């Protein structure tokens, strides 16, 4: 199956801050991941094995928006124990060519 989509540049749309957030949880991680995925600023959620139970990618307007998202939405979710935020400084490579090899 092939799907053709347009990929926008968040910077060009006024979203100057992107970050990856590692989330540690207690309880049903699938339910927490679904709640994280429902947040408007979240564009990627994956359940993982290792240091984090979930990894979340967010796109925010600025650092204040990121801080608000962390404090009032992500960390406020029942079952979220802690987070670790990795702020993107520069996107070096991003490609969408799965299945073209």
Describe every region a protein language model picked out.
Residues 1-101:
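A compositional/biophysical signature of low hydrophobicity enriched in polar/charged and small residues
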């Amino acid at each position: 199956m092939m799907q053709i989509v347009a990929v926008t540049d968040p910077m060009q749309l006024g979203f100057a801050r992107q970050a990856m957030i590692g989330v540690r949880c207690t309880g049903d991680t699938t339910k927490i991941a679904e709640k994280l995925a429902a947040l408007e600023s979240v564009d990627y959620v994956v359940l993982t094995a290792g240091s984090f139970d979930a990894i979340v990618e967010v796109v925010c307007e600025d650092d204040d928006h990121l801080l608000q998202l962390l404090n009032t939405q992500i960390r406020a979710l029942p079952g979220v124990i802690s987070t670790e935020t990795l702020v993107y400084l520069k996107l070096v490579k991003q490609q969408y060519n799965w299945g073209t090899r």
